[in-house]
C-alpha cells in the first residue's frame, strides 16, 4: 500500500526552505510535499491572513491522503486542518508547538502576553531587527547554540509583506485546545527541551487535552528542532509512519462488525466459550455496582451481566451491533456507541469493566489501557479476554506461501500488553494463556465463519481488489498441508486478564 504523502508546513518568519536539513532523509522514507504559507516563500500574499483563508489556501494543495508535519505556527495550522479533514489528514506530527502560543488565565504554560506584544510591536516598527532577534530565539538554549545560530542566519528571508504581521496576530489569537480534544487521528507532539518560545511545561497541558496523543521531548534542542536534531526528527517520522501502517482502521472495524450483526450469533461458538470462561472470573453478585461492557456486540453477555445485579452500560463501536442488541435485550443496559480508546465516560465512574475478544481490534493498546484506568474507580477491576499473535497461525502460514500481503490481523503479544497495563498505573492480578483449536472439513467453512463474524482481515497492507483465482487455488493447496485427522485446524491464542486500579 502506498504510504500517504508527508506534507511539510513551515512556521512564521521563514518558508519551505527551512526543511533543508531533513528533506533528503524524509524523502528516503515517504513521499514528501512542501507547502509555503500565503505571503511566505513563493506563495502570493492574501488580502487578509485570516484562519479560514489560510486553511483554505493550504487545503487546496493537500493530496487525497496525507500526514501533516508542521513546525510552530505550521503545526498549529496542521491541527486545525486535521480537525476539519479527518478523512484526508491521517495523522499529525506537531513540531515545537503549543495548544496556545500565548498564555491566558486558563492556559498559563505558554509565552507571556507582554513578551508577545513587545515582539509584535518591534516587528511592526523595525522588521529586520525583529527578525534578527527572532533568529536568536530559535537557537537560544540549544546545546549547539552558536553553530545553530550561524546556520539559521543564512535562512532569513529578504522579502516581507503585510501577511507577516497578520500571521503574528493570528499566532497570538489561535487556540487549538478544542481541536486537540476532538482530534481522533494519531498525533505526535515533538517538544524541544530548551525551547525559548514554547515552554517545556506545555507537555503536561497537552497531555491533559487528549490522552491518545503522544508526547516526546527532544533533549538539548532549541525551537529549531529540525536544524538542531535532524536525525531525531527523521527517526520520529519513520516511527510515526510505522504506527500508521499497523493501526486498525476503526471505521472499517465498525462497518465490518455492524454488517455481521444478524449472522454473528449463529457462528460465534468460540466467542461464546471464551466469554463464558471470562464470566467465571467475575463476582457472582454485582449489586449496587456500575459495570461497563466494552464491545458488547449482540448483547449476548450484556444480558447475562445484567442478571448479576449491576447497572450495565453496553458500549460498541458498531452502530449496527447496538441496534441489533437493543432489539434483542431492550432492558438489559444503556446502549452507547463509542470508541474504547476514547471512552465517553467520566473519570472514576465505573466499578467493573468486562470486555471479551474486543481489544485485539484496538490500534493503540497503551491509550486503551490509559482509558480503562481513567474510568475505573479506585479498587475497580477490569476483566478482559483478547487474542495473541499465535491466532490463525495456520492461515498465516498458508498465505505466506502465496504472497507477501497481510491476510491475518496482527495481534499484540503478552509483553506489550503487560507493559501497557503497567504504564497505565494498573496491576495485573491474573494473566492466563490458553490455546483453542477449531477444525473445519472445508476451507470455505472457515472463511465463511470469519466473514459471518465480521472478523476478516481489516489491517492495512492487505491485497486490494479481488483475489485472483490462481492465488486462491495456491492458498487452498497450502492450507491443505495443515490438515489433520480432525480436519483443517484454526488455532486461537487466547489471553485472559484481570486488572485492578489501585
Swiss-Prot record:
UniProt keyword Nucleotide-binding present: no
GO biological process terms held by the UniProt record: biotin biosynthetic process; methylation
EC number: 3.1.1.1, 2.1.1.197
InterPro entries on file: AB_hydrolase_1, AB_hydrolase_fold, AB_hydrolase_sf, BioC, Methyltransf_11, SAM-dependent_MTases_sf
Region described as Carboxylesterase: 1-224
Keyword Cytoplasm on entry: no
Annotated catalysed reactions: a carboxylic ester + H2O = an alcohol + a carboxylate + H(+); malonyl-[ACP] + S-adenosyl-L-methionine = malonyl-[ACP] methyl ester + S-adenosyl-L-homocysteine
Entry keyword set: Biotin biosynthesis, Hydrolase, Methyltransferase, Multifunctional enzyme, S-adenosyl-L-methionine, Transferase
Active site: 72, 195, 223
UniProt region (Malonyl-ACP O-methyltransferase), positions on chain: 225-502
GO cellular component terms, semicolon-separated: membrane
Pathway note: Cofactor biosynthesis; biotin biosynthesis
Ligand binding (substrate): 12, 134-138, 223
Similarity annotation: In the N-terminal section; belongs to the AB hydrolase superfamily. Carboxylesterase BioH family.
Entry function: Converts the free carboxyl group of a malonyl-thioester to its methyl ester by transfer of a methyl group from S-adenosyl-L-methionine (SAM). It allows to synthesize pimeloyl-ACP via the fatty acid synthetic pathway.
Listed name of the protein: Biotin biosynthesis bifunctional protein BioHC
Native species: Cellvibrio japonicus (strain Ueda107)
